[in-house]
């Protein structure tokens, strides 16, 4: 039997919904003729989601595991009920539905990373083998289903699977940065020392050229030293992204008193909307990659301070995003080495 290419045939509650906003979907692993069955090796849980679960569990890995099993048991997918976000997975193609066989560039045995969110992916976990809180990674035995419309990336052969997965997990951020940033722009990146932040810093620095400026915002001296040593920013400021007035003052001071053309929010905590908006000039752009962003706070906040800025939701997908992101690891030895130290 053939299902809807967007996966609506698996929605249990509420009827008529798409799989991502649905409260519950079917994780029956008998596939429809236009679905793909994946033998799952690991989940890379979205940073905002993992942080929330970890704090709720008091940093106890057994409680984190129990919470993940509870969520998947209730929803049929790994979608954090607080943040609404999911993550991505890595696995091996186990079966391809007859309507897709020979029509896609996948075969049984191929290793892939899914580039659609776990928040819409039917998932069944048989066992949680290990949890790595430092890299938001959960190694499991289980199965998942990719819909006909689902996007994916075959894992590259010139780098380790874990390294590729760490980068692909945030593929939308550097790719959108590549589209948004122009030569001569001044760019403020919040959460610059994190995985997506470092990628965005590198891509922004490349795009602004010698006449532009990239400033990273981090939480501590250790992160500041790391970014400056990497050479992927022009300056680094230390401030809490949850304190917008502090961010405004320190960020403008780092840009010769001038407002920025673009800000990129890669922070994994709530209440950072105004820190992204205040330092930006009228007519500038604010890119919210963070899944902890509130549309209401951003929209009303910008209005409240009279800011006429373009605000972009951090769409995890943009054309060519996997290739752009993996290319950063290939062309930048310092980014690749840093990722290997942090995420392997």
From Swiss-Prot:
GO biological process: L-lysine catabolic process to acetate
A GO MF term: L-erythro-3,5-diaminohexanoate dehydrogenase activity
Substrates-to-products reaction catalysed: (3S,5S)-3,5-diaminohexanoate + NAD(+) + H2O = (5S)-5-amino-3-oxohexanoate + NH4(+) + NADH + H(+)
Keyword Cytoplasm applies: no
Domain of life: Bacteria
Pathway noted in the entry: Amino-acid degradation; L-lysine degradation via acetate pathway
Alphabetically ordered keywords of this record: NAD, NADP, Oxidoreductase
InterPro entries the record matches: NAD(P)-bd_dom_sf
EC code: 1.4.1.11
Entry function: Involved in the anaerobic fermentation of lysine. Catalyzes the oxidative deamination of L-erythro-3,5-diaminohexanoate (3,5-DAH) to 3-keto-5-aminohexanoate (KAH).
Family affiliation: Belongs to the KDD family.
Complexes and interactors: Homodimer.
Name of the protein in its database record: L-erythro-3,5-diaminohexanoate dehydrogenase
């Amino acid at each position: 039997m053939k299902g809807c290419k967007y996966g609506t045939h698996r929605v249990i509650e509420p009827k008529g919904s798409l799989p991502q906003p649905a409260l519950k979907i079917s994780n029956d692993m008998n596939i429809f003729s236009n679905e793909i069955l994946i033998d799952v090796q690991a989940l890379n849980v979205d940073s905002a989601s993992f942080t929330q679960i970890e704090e709720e569990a008091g940093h106890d890995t057994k409680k984190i595991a129990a919470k993940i099993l509870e969520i998947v048991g209730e929803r049929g997918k790994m979608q954090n009920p607080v943040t609404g976000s999911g993550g991505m997975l890595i696995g091996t193609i186990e079966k391809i539905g007859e309507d897709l066989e020979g029509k896609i560039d996948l075969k049984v045995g191929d290793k892939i990373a899914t580039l659609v969110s776990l928040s819409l992916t039917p998932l069944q976990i048989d066992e949680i083998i290990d949890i790595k809180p430092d890299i938001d990674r959960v190694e499991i035995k289980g199965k998942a289903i990719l819909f006909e419309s689902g996007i994916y990336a075959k894992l590259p052969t010139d780098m380790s699977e874990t390294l590729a997965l760490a980068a692909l997990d945030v593929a939308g951020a550097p790719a959108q940065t590549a589209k948004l940033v122009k030569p001569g722009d001044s760019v403020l990146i919040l959460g610059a020392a994190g995985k997506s932040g470092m990628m965005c810093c590198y891509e922004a620095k490349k795009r602004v050229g010698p006449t532009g400026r990239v400033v990273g915002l981090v939480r501590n001296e250790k992160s500041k030293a790391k970014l400056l040593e990497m050479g992927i920013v022009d300056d680094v400021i230390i401030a809490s992204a949850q304190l917008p007035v502090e961010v405004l003052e320190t960020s403008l001071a780092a840009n010769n008193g001038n407002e920025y053309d673009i800000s990129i929010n890669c922070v994994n905590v709530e209440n950072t909307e105004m820190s992204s908006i205040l330092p930006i000039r009228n007519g500038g752009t604010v890119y919210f990659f963070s899944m902890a962003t509130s549309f209401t706070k951003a929209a009303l906040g910008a209005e409240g301070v009279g800011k006429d800025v373009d605000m972009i939701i951090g769409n995890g997908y943009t054309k060519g995003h996997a290739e752009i992101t993996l290319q950063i690891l290939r062309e930048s030895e310092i980014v690749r080495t840093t990722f290997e130290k942090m995420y392997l």
